[in-house]
């Protein structure tokens, strides 16, 4: 691969990545409490975009892929693993404000540390040869499986959201957020594929980099549009939560009444 083509692809993608990342991180939202969760989701997505931008920057300014291929593989795999967690968390938060917990955050951090450490051991300590190739393949499989599991969580969350909107007769909103499902399947194909694309022959790497431009552009466009309907979406979720709480309360009340009748019945017979 000619460095000029590779550099041009990075030169094209990097400014957009930086713009999207900083915009997601610092752009304002309507000053309403209901938008707090949307803002957190967008900021997490912004952090993920800036991490990817940092990855692209190292490739662009230092040409690490040409100087040390092993370090390039390690950096890419470690970055993608962390970004998978950030992407999935940001998207699910749009439809489940309770998704992020301390336990889940620490679990993802620990998994990332373990994955990055093992990747470093395989790349730098395991001798080149069949054992190293098998180990790298195993790590790539782990990365892909991790991405698929997270993508499945996103899809399940969105299907639940569509069900809620269908039950509340909010078809217009339900149809509108179907972009989330579309984006999720796109992310599954493109994002999870990064685990395999890390091992692409050099002459095809620029195609992978350029293909990221429409992917992240669609993400930016979708977040901007989703902001228009976010308040209605949150209100629909609030109604669903209240309905579930009412059903739970009614169920507990009926259970208590039945229990009282069972207790009083023998006494009345006396």
Question: Where would I find each of the regions flagged by the language model?
Answer:
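Membrane-water interface of transmembrane alpha-helices
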Residues: 17-26, 83, 146-162
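Interfacial "cap-and-anchor" motif at the non-cytosolic start of specific transmembrane alpha-helices
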Residues: 182-238
């Amino acid at each position: 691969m000619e460095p000029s083509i590779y550099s041009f692809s990075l030169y094209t993608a990097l400014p957009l990545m930086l713009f999207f990342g900083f915009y997601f991180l610092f752009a304002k939202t309507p000053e309403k409490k209901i938008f707090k969760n949307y803002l957190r989701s967008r900021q997490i997505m912004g952090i993920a975009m800036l991490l990817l931008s940092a990855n692209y920057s190292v490739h662009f300014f230092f040409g690490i892929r040409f100087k040390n291929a092993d370090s390039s593989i390690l950096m890419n795999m470690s970055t993608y693993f962390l970004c998978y967690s950030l992407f999935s968390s940001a998207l699910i938060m749009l439809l489940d404000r309770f998704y992020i917990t301390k336990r889940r955050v620490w679990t993802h951090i620990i998994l990332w540390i373990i994955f990055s450490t093992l990747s470093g051991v395989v790349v730098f300590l395991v001798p080149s040869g069949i054992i190293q190739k098998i180990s790298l393949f195993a790590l790539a499989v782990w990365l892909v499986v991790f991405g698929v599991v997270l993508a499945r969580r996103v899809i399940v969350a969105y299907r639940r959201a569509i069900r809620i909107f269908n039950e509340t007769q909010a078809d217009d909103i339900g149809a509108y957020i179907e972009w989330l499902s579309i984006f999720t399947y796109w992310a599954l194909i493109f994002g999870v594929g990064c685990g395999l694309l890390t091992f692409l022959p050099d002459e095809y790497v620029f195609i992978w980099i350029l293909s990221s431009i429409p992917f992240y552009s669609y993400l930016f466009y979708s977040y901007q549009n989703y902001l228009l309907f976010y308040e209605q979406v949150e209100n629909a979720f609030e109604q669903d939560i209240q309905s579930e709480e009412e059903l739970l309360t009614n169920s507990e009340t009926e259970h208590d009444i039945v229990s009282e009748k069972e207790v009083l019945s023998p006494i009345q017979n006396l």
